[in-house]
Every structure is written in C-alpha cells, then in structure tokens.
Amino acid sequence: MSESPSANISDADKSAITPTTGDTSQQDVKPSTEHINLKVVGQDNNEVFFKIKKTTEFSKLMKIYCARQGKSMNSLRFLVDGERIRPDQTPAELDMEDGDQIEAVLEQLGGCTHLCL
C-alpha cells in the first residue's frame, strides 16, 4: 500500500468517497454536508487526512490510522478538544465540522510514585 496524504475509510465506502483536490472549477460542485474532512495528528506531528461520512463510527478511522502508523488500537487514544473519542461515536454525535482535528496520543499507564520517608 502506498502512502498518500489522505486515507479512505473502507472499500465499501469508496463509492461515496471523493478525493480532495481543491478544484472547484466544476459547475455541479455543491457543498456536501454528508461528508467531512478530518485531520488526525500524531505526537510526531504527522498528519493523516480522512474524508468520512458524519454517520461513520470512529472505529473505522481509528483502525486505518493505527494500521498506517504500525500501532495497535490499544496503544493510542484519540482526542477531540482534549476529550477521548470512543470507537462507537460518530462525527455527527460530537458536532464535528469540516476541517476539525483529532489528536492521536500514546496511551500512558501507571503513574505510581515511590514515597520516600
């Protein structure tokens, strides 16, 4: 699979997904409220762009992002405005808009400190 700046959600959704080119010269171009463009930013500032339906569960986006980054879904947390996203949520549920950003951060466990007396 070749790396590209944008990722599609699934093979089943390919018929409903159009590439983002920025070309608005066509006469029949109309704004789509069914799809939105989202940007996932990792801790290394790597950006991956997704165009998904507002009703698509984030689990699809998460799986594709993790596969591209070579990480397991259990090792990352996905955040919007500092709040964790659940895999069963959708962009519509979170009132997300075109161009919104999702942060992908490593899960941190532990935090126990030693108490010296």
Swiss-Prot record:
Coiled coil: none annotated. Residues 112-117 form a propeptide. One of its GO terms (biological process) is telomere maintenance. Residues 17-30 have a biased composition (Polar residues). GO terms for molecular function: protein tag activity; ubiquitin-like protein ligase binding. Keywords: Isopeptide bond, Nucleus, Ubl conjugation pathway. There is a cross-link at residue 111 (Glycyl lysine isopeptide (Gly-Lys) (interchain with K-? in acceptor proteins)). Residues 35-115 form the Ubiquitin-like domain. InterPro entries: Rad60/SUMO-like_dom, Ubiquitin-like_dom, Ubiquitin-like_domsf. PANTHER family: SMALL UBIQUITIN-RELATED MODIFIER. Required for chromosome segregation where it may be involved in microtubule assembly. Loss of smt3 leads to an increase in telomere length. Belongs to the ubiquitin family. SUMO subfamily. Interacts with rfp1. This is Ubiquitin-like protein pmt3/smt3. The gene is pmt3.
